């Protein structure tokens, strides 16, 4: 069994069950993000084993090199990376009409396909505050021009880390280039 092969109490997720039943080498064509409750259970299990849980969030609408570099750097800060992904309605409120370009299910699939991403959790609000209250990660990571004092939900993480933006990459720039602007 999956849980038996782990030290301590371990919640078996639906992705692990599919891997066990169908083989982990199968080509995935979909990913169902885990619920907040499943994510909390995993975070608690990882932390009980002394493993560091890193959390970041974003829209990740058109995944690009800047996103990948940022997520690799975030993942390197601990053993597990969880991404809070803005739901479609949240992205629309934050970014305006015509966004997101990619649906939340497609964005979640692309993020989960990255080997250094452990889980993706969708949130409907404009900020991840309630999700951070639920998960209480060891490290909360934000990108670019934030100051630690301005990070929403910092009180629910052990520490906050600010990583630099990768210059020259943004979803808005990609969209404008495609549109010939």
Show which residues each predicted segment covers:
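Conserved post-catalytic alpha-helical subdomain immediately downstream of the catalytic base
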Residues: 1-19, 23
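Nucleotidyltransferase catalytic core that binds NTPs
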Residues: 23-181
């Amino acid at each position: 069994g999956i849980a038996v092969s782990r030290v301590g109490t371990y919640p078996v997720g639906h992705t692990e069950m599919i891997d066990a039943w169908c083989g982990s080498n199968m080509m995935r064509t979909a990913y169902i993000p885990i619920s907040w409750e499943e994510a909390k259970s995993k975070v608690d299990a990882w932390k009980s084993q002394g493993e560091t849980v890193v959390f970041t969030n974003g829209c990740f609408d058109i995944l690009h090199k800047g996103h990948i570099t940022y997520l690799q750097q975030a993942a390197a800060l601990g053993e597990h990376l969880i991404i809070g992904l803005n739901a479609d309605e949240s992205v629309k409120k934050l970014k305006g009409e015509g966004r997101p370009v990619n649906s939340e299910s497609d964005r979640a699939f692309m993020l989960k396909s990255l080997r250094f991403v452990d889980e993706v959790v969708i949130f409907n609000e404009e900020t991840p505050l309630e999700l951070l209250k639920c998960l209480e990660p060891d490290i909360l990571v934000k990108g670019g021009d934030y100051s630690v004092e301005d990070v929403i939900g910092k009180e629910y993480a052990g520490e906050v880390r600010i990583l630099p933006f990768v210059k020259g990459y943004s979803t808005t720039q990609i969209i404008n280039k495609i549109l010939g602007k």
